[in-house]
A protein has these predicted regions:
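Substrate-binding/specificity loop regions of serine endopeptidase catalytic domains
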Residues: 27
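Anion-binding and metal-coordination hotspots
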Residues: 1-21, 30-560
Length: 560
């Protein structure tokens, strides 16, 4: 090999890029986009589907401001992976991505995302038995023209980001029982969960039945059944939700449970036997609401008790301080007779005792003299004596039994379901399905990672909406990366060793991407090579993902 050959050898960090592109291929993102949007393959240099695919990979791989993408991919040596495709990095510029987003906005993006989600579901031979749905808010900065007639409006609303100072839009999504996305929808920033949840469930039932997915159980938080009207909307639909406290029967049933019911001990629901895992007990019954029978599962858990103890202690401390202030104010008032003082004391003590605090009271008598003339009184000066009565209260500790009852009530909640088959879905399984709601909350955490959008992507609300659907595709790819690795670990009885030496069977998508971050690839004479000394940790992660090392030596197959 001469010196010129050595100079033509280039080593670069391929990172997770080939893996992410392959995941997009499995999802058929480019094909689905190209099939749904209007574009002319003979005129377009790069298909809109491939541009959307590149955008997904960019967002997942790059945790930096999302603009000047062309420069970014040039630094990543993407031209080596695109070689022989007829596409250059220069064609992957911000304007091209903006045009692709504009094309995306012309189609039913909710349907597009659902199609892609089902592609992944079928590729992994998975089913839909239950769906968990929820929303999250995405805060944005900038000025936007608002058309009140639009279905999608960037505006102020209840912020789940704790940023009420910023305008926002919302993302509603649903995941199946394994926590994998099956639908996503962009919502106006002020869209209420109470409106969206029942609406979305009705729409999803129709859509998925059309795809031959039947008898799905829909699981949502208490916003799903916030009113009698919400329950009417869900008639004929299998659902599980938490009955909110605004239904008076909830407090009545909790009170009944406090008095004593035949609890069924469930124990832990966690897959692991980790110390401190939440333990549950349940009590089942059937009652009618608005003339329709439902199953109810009363649930008590020690985990909520631990969470609520500090909250309640703060509440009780503040409550006692307020009572002591009121007692002090009353203690400064002068009463003309004992009866008046006792009457005032009785009213206050009734209030204190209703809040379950111990209280003691005593009346003090104070005699004051009023002399007939001003100045220092003499021994012979006449005076008039006035007797006043003051009532003093001492606020004691709160009654132990009352504290215990409050903790019980706060640690107990009521599940409602229209699934009446107790044999197939006993109470513990209804609870387990509801607790699976955390899977979508975990999925949303990945969307909360900072992704900064450049000016071209925020130029108009329609483009922001299209970008929001790209975020849902990012969530899809991230979820399946986790699923593939975790399933492989579970099936093989293996585990991932974390940097701190701990074993894990549930590595996060961030961990997976971090392991692949240092993959080095050699480019020489038009070919790609993976060095022989590639870290075994990287090779093992590829194995868990279901890919061979060859994924790094193949060029990207561009979809036109």
């Amino acid at each position: 090999m001469d010196i010129n050959d050595v100079k033509s050898i280039i080593a670069y960090n391929a990172s997770s890029i080939p893996v992410l592109f392959e995941m997009c291929r499995i999802a058929k993102i480019a094909e689905t986009v190209n099939d749904m949007v209007e574009w002319k393959s003979d005129n377009a240099k790069v298909s809109p589907g491939f541009l959307i695919e590149v955008l997904v990979v960019t967002i997942m791989h790059r945790r930096q401001p999302l603009w000047k993408i062309e420069e970014y991919w040039r630094k990543q040596k993407l031209e080596f992976m695109l070689e022989d495709s007829g596409i250059t990095v220069e064609q992957l510029n911000d304007d091209a991505f903006a045009r692709a987003l504009d094309k995306l906005q012309t189609v039913n993006m909710k349907e597009l995302v659902s199609r892609i989600c089902l592609n992944m579901l079928k590729a992994h031979n998975l089913t839909i038995e239950s769906l968990h749905l929820d929303t999250t808010s995405i805060s944005v900065e900038g000025l936007y023209e608002v058309d009140e007639e639009d279905d999608f409006i960037i505006c102020y609303g209840y912020s789940k980001d704790n940023r009420p100072d910023l305008k926002q839009f919302k993302i509603g999504a649903a995941v199946q029982q394994s926590g994998l996305p099956v639908m996503g929808q962009l919502l106006s920033g002020n869209k209420s969960d109470r409106e969206w949840n029942p609406e979305a469930i009705k729409e999803m039932k129709v859509f998925f039945e059309g795809q031959q997915y039947r008898d799905i159980i829909f699981v949502g938080d208490s916003a799903t059944v916030s009113s009698y009207e919400s329950l009417r909307q869900l008639e004929g639909i299998r659902f599980i939700s938490r009955l909110p406290e605004n239904f008076s029967c909830v407090s009545e049933w909790k009170e009944k449970a406090w008095q004593g019911v035949n609890w069924e001990e469930v124990g832990t629901l966690s897959e692991s036997s980790r110390k401190g895992a939440a333990e549950y007990r349940i009590y089942e019954f059937v009652e009618a609401i608005d003339g329709k029978p439902y199953r109810f599962v009363l649930v008590h858990t020690n985990s909520l008790r631990e969470q609520k103890t500090k909250t309640l202690q703060k509440r009780w401390e503040k409550e006692k301080q307020e009572l002591e202030k009121e007692a002090k104010r009353i203690g400064k008032r002068a009463f003309a007779c004992v009866e008046d003082a006792m009457r005032e004391s009785a009213a206050f003590m009734e209030k204190v005792e209703s809040l379950h605090y111990n209280v003691e009271a005593h009346i003090e008598e104070k005699v004051s003299r009023k002399y007939s003339r001003r100045g220092r009184p003499g021994t012979e000066d006449s005076y008039e004596e006035t007797v006043s009565y003051y009532v003093k209260h001492t606020i004691g500790e709160r009654d132990d039994m009352a504290c215990e009852k409050d903790l019980f009530m706060e640690s107990t909640f009521v599940l409602i379901t229209s699934v009446m088959d107790r044999d197939r879905y006993p109470g513990w399984r209804i609870l387990a399905e509801y607790k699976g709601q955390s899977s979508i909350e975990q999925a949303f955490k990945f969307l909360k990672s900072p992704v900064y959008l450049g000016p071209v992507y925020l130029k108009k609300p329609e483009r922001v909406e299209a970008m929001g659907y790209v975020f849902i595709l990012v969530l899809l790819i991230a979820s399946y990366l986790e699923y593939r690795v975790r399933k492989a670990l579970r099936d093989r009885g293996e585990y991932y060793i974390q940097p701190n030496g701990q074993k894990s069977t549930r590595p996060s998508v961030r961990t997976i991407l971090e392991v692949l971050e240092t993959v080095l690839v050699i480019y020489f004479n038009g070919n790609l090579y993976l060095p022989n000394d590639t870290s075994p940790k990287i090779l093992k992660m590829l194995e868990w993902l279901g890919f061979s090392p060859d994924i790094y030596t193949k060029k990207i197959n561009v979809i036109f």
